[in-house]
Amino acid sequence: MKIVHICISAPYIDGWGYQENLLPKYLQQAGIQNAVIASGNDFPFYLSTQEISDIKAKGENYTIGEVYIKRIKTKRFSTSFLVPFHLMDAIEAIQPDVIFHHNFNCTSLPIAARYAKRNNIPLVVDNHADVLNMSHNRIWAFVYYKLLIGLTCKAIQKTIVKAYGVSHSRCDFIKEYYGIDQKKIDLLPIGADVDIADTIPSKEILRQKYGYQETDFIVVSGGKMGVEKGTDQLILATERIRKNNPNSRIKLVLFGKIEDEDTLLQAKQSQVVTLFDWCDRIKTLELLKMADVACWPIHHTTLIEDAVAVCTPLIIRKTDTTEHLIEGNGIWIENGSAEAIERAMSLLLNQDEMRKSAMQQGCEKMKNRLSYNTIAEKVVKDIYGSRQ
């Protein structure tokens, strides 16, 4: 079997840990040929000039591991409107048995559907959009999602064999906004890169490396941080625990970027906080693994799946985008307030050995459930099932 991944709307950035990168890698490891077709000239704004130059220097055809990468020209007419050139030629050259189109919101989808229909092969599409990250302009959201994409999906629905949402809310979005038949919709969560996670040294070694003691209780959070992400409340909760229990040795590690000046000043002035800038993939996993708990008080981030990969317990708010991420491997909070965070951290801080052991078993189970090995296996089963 040969699967081609169309990553025009969802950018494919060499060496990153997004689903577009990891799913082809793990499917390849399962013995299935994988190819990726991505833009060769349109890259996210957050990439540096050097990163873009490094990708372009590889040319239009190269491999990462055993996954074949094909870069094609695209033209962006607006933030939401990206047009690929010679996509059909690229697909025909690969001659796939399956097309996996990443995201619904791109003009590449009807092209992929036309090839799939003409050659009688399965078309699978995933969705990362929901009501939280869609446009807040209601008129534009209706025109773009319900009319433009919805009418496109209606025209090609018979060709789509599976429509995946990466969370339950994004499964609901597929039905409500795109009109896809409920029978075709399924959850395919963002997974855990267990291969790289298993190469990270032990917690003891990492604490020595970063200057922490075995008796320290380390809380970690990262990514884009600030008031909107609840980082200010996380700092406040940690400081309260330190004040009320000076012997707790609680410490807060933050990495990434704090986006508002007030929270940045709060973090710099706090005696419990250590700040790191953006980290590469290895250092990110190291900081997550050395911690006793990882906390994101308000919104989902793919760093949560990274924490799952290294078996670090979680404190997160239960929402439609996170409700599948805790089952014995952490604590839900009802809101992102300092009081809610403090209660959850205190529970973990005061656990007896039996509860710690049970929590660790829960972490291992969630790691196995979200492993990209498990997710790749599901995709293969779904594809074979669609052919019966």
Q: Which functions belong to the PLM regions below?
A:
Residues V4, Y164, Q213-K229, I235-T238, ...:
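Conserved donor-binding/catalytic core segment of Leloir-type glycosyltransferases
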Residues G40, S169, G191:
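Carbohydrate-associated surface elements
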Residues I316, G328-E339, L347-E353:
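Conserved acidic donor-binding segment of nucleotide-sugar-dependent glycosyltransferases
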